[in-house]
Every structure is written in C-alpha cells, then in structure tokens.
C-alpha cells in the first residue's frame, strides 16, 4: 500500500531563496512609489522611463548571452515590449524611447548560473 504522507523533505532551492529574501522584498516594496497617493502622471512616466532604462539593456544582454538555461520561456517573462507600449501611452514615440538613458552598470552574464540568478531577480 502506498503512503499518502506529505513530503516533508528539505525545502527546495526556490523556497529557500524566497524565505531568505522575503524581508528584503518587503523593505524594497515599501520604497517603491507605485501605490503612493502622491504618484501623479508625470511621476508614473518617469518611473516607466527608469524601468525601461534598466530592463531594456539587461534583457538585451541576457538574450544576447546565449547562456539562458534550456527550457526557460523568455517570451513569457520579457518586460521591455510592455514598457515600450506603456511609454507610448503618455505620448513618447519610438525615437524618444530609444533616446532614454540606459543603465550601464550591469551584472556579469558570463555563465548560465549568472543568467539564472539575474532572471530570478528580474522575476521579482
């Protein structure tokens, strides 16, 4: 007869990461202005521009690296196209979006493990 006991083995790596970083996530979320009563349209546009300035170069570097682990569905997780679409909303055209400043202090993406770590952080 098969046992119906729940597996009580060691937590998965993902569970350990979530547990180990949960307080940091809470602290970070408290600093983000998304739900601030003071966030106006101009502030939201600047926030989108800042996110684009980070996500566009890091996603480009990730996908150009050729080191993303097999089986990772990038189409479901890429954020840059959505940010571009959202930036069109307040009237920015593609030329203005392409001229936005980009983050140049990117992490090294020279191993599959480094790429996986960055993908984990980007996923939030």
Predicted regions, residues:
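Metal- and O2-centered redox machinery and metal/ROS homeostasis
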Residues: 1-124
